[in-house]
Design a protein with these regions (language model features):
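Short, surface-exposed loop/turn segments at secondary-structure junctions
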Residues: 1-5, 28-38, 74
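Short amphipathic alpha-helical segments enriched in hydrophobics
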Residues: 22, 26, 48, 52-55
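Low-complexity intrinsically disordered segments
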Residues: 40-42, 50-107
């Protein structure tokens, strides 16, 4: 992601689309359990709020802790890269679990 704002927008769009699809399926497709669909929508909302809360993190070291500015920038870059990668992996795992639940509604 280019910045935190666009990452948060993408998280909101993805979760909103999933919730919309679940509501659409609940209302249009006969035989879908409304309680399970509502539970999935609640899970989507929880995933969204958790992911948005995790987007804010800070590098806890200062320039003085390193030998040079280059070492500081390198360490800071790798820290944020790993943090965003972890956030995206957790978010994608949550999305996969929700999609499996949504597909289970159709059985």
């Amino acid at each position: 992601m280019a910045n935190k704002r666009s990452l948060k927008k993408q998280i909101r769009y993805i979760c909103g689309d999933l919730a919309g699809e679940c509501i659409f399926a609940r209302e249009i497709i006969p035989g879908i359990d409304h309680d399970k669909a509502n539970g999935i929508i609640i899970d989507i909302a929880a995933l969204q709020s958790e992911a948005l809360a995790k987007t804010t993190f800070a590098f806890d070291k200062s320039v003085r802790d390193f030998e040079s500015r280059h070492a500081y920038r390198t360490a800071r870059h790798s820290y944020f890269k790993n943090a965003y990668k972890t956030l995206l992996n957790e978010f994608n795992a949550g999305i996969d679990a929700i999609l499996k639940e949504m597909n289970g509604l159709l059985d």
